[in-house]
């Protein structure tokens, strides 16, 4: 009988087998790592063991829903609302809030780790839908485009707040298969 508040219900997880595979894989990896640390240090405090096991479960859960994000439209079919919610969940719990895709176009950042286990995701979601945030963003325009196109598309005045978030100037500054190189940094 299902006693996990719907966690393993395919309406929620979409693919029980993949979820279990990710959890088991992460548990095995964590247990192997714990054994290695115990051998090196001669033991592991009980609290550390519990935190690592919790992290294995959370990481497995994260990895499953990262797969759902990566394979939405092919292996998985979810509504736009669920895709947005899943994206927010993945971005909130990925390591260092990094944004990176591999050469196949799949988001490949791992779970953030033990420190992320105590994040208050429900509190963040509640805040996003609060009246305070609604009032702040009700006249906000968010664009994802080249900054020159943005400046050519709007007539700004001194009361406008503009936030530009350029990619890092590094060797891995490829975002959604769009490069941002040294000459782009100079243009900016």
Task: Say what each PLM segment does.
Residues 1, 88, 92-95, 101, ...:
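Conserved proline-anchored active-site loop of SAM-dependent methyltransferases
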Residues 1-137:
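Class I S-adenosyl-L-methionine-dependent methyltransferase module
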Residues 112-115, 167, 187-188:
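Glycine-rich loops and low-complexity Gly/Arg-rich segments
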């Amino acid at each position: 009988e299902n006693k996990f508040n719907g966690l393993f219900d395919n309406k929620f997880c979409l693919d029980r087998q993949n979820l279990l595979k990710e959890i088991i894989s992460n548990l095995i990896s964590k247990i192997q790592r714990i054994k290695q640390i115990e051998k090196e240090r001669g033991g592991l405090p009980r609290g550390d063991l519990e935190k690592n096991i919790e992290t294995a479960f959370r990481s497995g859960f994260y990895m499953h829903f990262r797969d759902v994000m990566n394979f939405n439209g092919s292996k998985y079919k979810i509504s736009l609302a669920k895709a947005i919610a899943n994206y927010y969940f993945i971005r909130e719990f990925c390591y260092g809030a990094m944004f990176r895709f591999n050469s196949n176009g799949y988001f490949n950042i791992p779970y953030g780790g033990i420190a992320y286990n105590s994040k208050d995701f429900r509190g963040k979601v509640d805040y996003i839908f609060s009246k305070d945030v609604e009032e702040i963003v009700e006249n906000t325009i968010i664009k994802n485009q080249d900054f020159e196109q943005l400046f050519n598309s709007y007539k700004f005045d001194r009361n406008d707040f503009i936030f530009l978030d350029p990619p890092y100037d590094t060797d891995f500054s490829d975002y959604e298969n769009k490069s941002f190189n040294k000459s782009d940094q100079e243009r900016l």
